Amino acid sequence: MMKRLIFSGLLFLSLSFLALNFFNTNENVSESQDEIKLDKATYAAEYYKYRMASRADANGRVPMDGLLRAKEHIARMPQSRDAGLWEWDWIGPSNIGGRIRAILPDPNNASKLWIGSVSGGIWKSTNSGTTWTPVNDFMTNLAITSMVFDPATTSIMYAATGEGFGNSDGLPGAGILKSTDSGLTWNQLESTNNANFTYVNRLAAHPDPDSAGIIYAVTNANRVYKTIDGGVTWVNKFTTASNAVDIRVDQNNPNEIIVGCKSKVYLSTDYGETWSNETSGVANKLPSDGGRCEVTFCPSNSNRIYVSMNRNLGEIWRSNDNGVTWQLRNTGTNYFGGAPGQGWYDNTIWVNPAYSTQIVVGGVDLWRSTDGGTTLTKISRWQDYHNGGAANSAHADQHFIIEAADYNSTTNPKVYFGNDGGIQKANNVWTVSNNSGWTNLAGTSLGISQFFGGAAANDGSIIVGGLQDNDKVRYKSSGSWSGPNNWYQATTGDGGYAAINYNNTSILYGEYVYLKIKKSTNSGDSYSNSYSGLSDAGNSLLALFIAPFSMDPNNPAYLVAGGSKIWRTTNNASNWTQIRGAIGSFINGNGDIEFYKCSTIDIDKGNSAVIWVGYTNGNVAKTSNTGIDWTRVDANDGGLPNRYVTDIAINPNNSNEVFVTFGGYNNDDVWYTPDAGVNWENRSGTVPNDLPVLQVNTVRYHPANSNWIYIGTDLGVFASQDRGVNWSVVTNFNGNEGPVNTEVAELFWQGNEFLIAATHGRGMYRTAAPPAVIYVNSTAPIGGNGSQASPFKTVYEASQVAGPGATISIESGTYTETQIVTFLNEGYIIVTNGSVVIQ
């Protein structure tokens, strides 16, 4: 009797949240370059709204202790290697960056540089940014917003977590991290493991090297904190009237501290003991009706202070008398982008340490002034940053500016810039222009890309995906794997889901925001609009910011897309036809009629007429006749959760079996039906093998083994080999295994062999070992190679081709092998009654 043994590799991630924020907007977005940034204020806000919507409860909140409790649960889970091996390969991109809010040059070594990514952790360069290495991937949180050295030594470092620049609570960070070994290892300061430190937006260190351990922190809890013992304890020195986002200590007079908030600026002249409100709105003071305020002292003039205020699309204010009076230096330049502006999101200001009249301010692009802000000259143009910065400019959306450690205004005016595209450098900040003088430092080995989704050709020759503010990217090879640096960025803006024509890999599909489907006929070199007839496209009231579409696994000319309605094309997206109407609407916070939107789609592999869809309000429906009739299945058998549907997976081998996942911090995020939705079972696991309470983003069947299920969450990938009755997380056998502590946005297969995890912060990972189909026949001669034509004779022979920890499943039938097979001291298999289990 012939039997098939299936070997598979999978690593389980141990991940942490990207700090998120909730914003509400409903304006349309155009995909033309000039209009993208005019509407960037809208879609930057929509990005946070989209990310928050699936995670928040009915009150728009995520539990502040949700991350901690989920991690504690994972620590208690049994450790095993269910449903596969443990190894992954990082496949990039390493030449396309992601959002950076922290840059830290080493004052003792100008070649040494650290950056903090908002979802990719801390990275280090020892050659001025030419190459980068991730630091301590498995620390508590990778949402880095600020970094400083201890005043006394650069061997002690502090990193803030939690990106809190929005209007209301998002997902929590993990307080403040500290390293005492020059950044090699990082640990959470226990004193910051509480709700007051869930968003730590900025750190500042006392400038005196004799003041060891004195650090300041500002948070979204409206607090200004100070520690004098290196973070063992913190004292709230002041409670602000709004979220505190920036803090600076005067390098010449450390008793003077300035704090920028959302709409407020506060100044202290006594080390933070007392504070004055500089935004009182009275004569000679700052206005009281502004937005986010970024602040800076002038090292060459202790009486001079600058503020970049999110007001009137960008205002620069200056004080020449240490805050006694203030003067408006510039307004109307519109450096925060089109109305209403996005200074709440990207806002930064830097002053030349040598000359207090020379400044650079950043919003969407960068502007330079040599007269104290009265005149601004644009020095970067986001449209000229393309394909990893090859066109020589800075990426859009500026978050941080800092001079090089060996900066000299005359002989070495080198300055670094952190933005949504990573980090760029101007060797001469006083001569750099829109498209001249820029060096992209995120173009070789900085892997912090934020994917929403992706797809792979069956042979792996093309892998595509959509990124936050770095749009549609593509890996392409003509043969063997050519490395994570071989990615190409076709366009700019925000990307989303992706698909590849499996019969003709020159035909690719991607999207711009709000369901604007794009098509490439040249393997991703360029894209064109492909949403004719799709009337939901481009309207935030009708489609999600990142809206779902799916290619038919039976015919690549067929695709299905979802907005308020469901749409289908049968001619390679040349035009679209509605196959389901809207299911309902509501009045949103702006008073507009907004429709419930499709959030996920799956199509049966064996029958194109069978389509399942899920919605933001928990509605789940199916059709068996390509949309002529639809049946709601979420109310059957007691009903599914009334929450955002994050994903649907139809068993490719049996269309009656379907998994549906839901967003939020709940213990019922994974559901299974064995009979096409007639009955439902909560498959979040059985104690002690149950899943933690956390966000589930994606679910996939193994193509060759329907018992094996994989989910991607905000805390990693979990696997089950019994259809979700029990779940496992892999143990740490040999150091840090697998992808790092960042969110898995989507799981997808490369053919039937490799599982790929698209992460929102560290690019893509792919399982190192493909599932191999091995044949065993007890009547075969010894010496087979495991192929169908030349099978192995025994399970023992077959096991020799599998790696350590492999799981072997034998198809139905009886097998008489009883020999115990050792797997490199990491477990063994026992064959009993035709089944094989890991012990």
Region locations from a protein language model:
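Beta-propeller blade termini and top-face loops
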Residues: 25-770
